[in-house]
């Protein structure tokens, strides 16, 4: 059809679809702008033209004059590579060479990808500048990682720069990058920021840093993480009852010693404590019988070890004989916890026999037994 060819290709005077003597069609000016102008000029110069032909010729000449100002229509590049000129609008899905893998079409596809990436990058930078997130910065060299160094001169903390010249970044970069919020790798926390190590170049396993998680408590009675409290609540209960009203006349400290667990009984040394055998220390499983990782608490002497065994205390033969004398007490800690109730048995008597005989005037066994009875 001549009108379609005129729409797809710009017609030249040698390719005019109509002869000069042929009367024009009324719709010729609506399809092709150049062909309509030629048809209008031919109809105006023809002798047998009517007034309708002259009117259409003048309208087509107006369209031809307006065509110079209109923007050009983009053409399909793939069709152009293969010798065809097709307008690009609405043509992408119907292009016969959209899946072509020839050299020219591959080059076109690669250029399209690059242009799309550049457009997206410019759009993102414009949005970030409008929001005030970032500012345009010069890109680093090809193989250089922008890792800030500690104190601008020490060795890098976790990563090393991959550049061949290994030039340190300028001194203004670490200070201004963090303030301006640039999209760079943030500061790696320095080892010196922990407050206990000075000028360490690399990350090392510090015993002082990890031991700060396991600091001993402020109360020396609970010095072990895995140990039960060494002093039970019966001590406070008995000491309070002994201080309020004590018919025995003895010291309340001595009377409150009945509330101590079985392993801790007073020896002849006064404030120091001796332990019974390790098996009867606590009625618990073996996983809690762990030695403390910390030095002995403050209530023990400097030269006194934390745990006593049979071999550790050779200088107390009398006290050791009296401490380990009761054979029937499986765990005297249970007896000491319930010592506030009126119970009279061999275990309580055995615990009371463990009191030192060096102070007979201040405390005796007989009044306690009579009170229990």
UniProtKB/Swiss-Prot annotation:
Question: What PROSITE patterns does the record tag this protein with?
Answer: DM_1 (PS40000), DM_2 (PS50809)
Q: Which GO terms describe its molecular function?
A: chromatin binding; cis-regulatory region sequence-specific DNA binding; DNA-binding transcription activator activity, RNA polymerase II-specific; DNA-binding transcription factor activity, RNA polymerase II-specific; identical protein binding; metal ion binding; RNA polymerase II cis-regulatory region sequence-specific DNA binding; sequence-specific double-stranded DNA binding
Give the superkingdom in one word: Eukaryota
Q: Which organism is it from?
A: Homo sapiens
**What Gene3D superfamilies has UniProt attached to this entry?**
DM DNA-binding domain
Q: Does the keyword DNA-binding apply?
A: yes
Where does it localize? Nucleus
- Name the GO terms of the biological process aspect: cell morphogenesis; germ cell migration; intracellular signal transduction; male germ cell proliferation; male sex determination; male sex differentiation; meiosis I; negative regulation of meiotic nuclear division
- Tell me the protein's name: Doublesex- and mab-3-related transcription factor 1
Q: Which parts of the sequence carry Phosphoserine?
A: 339
What gene does this protein come from? DMRT1
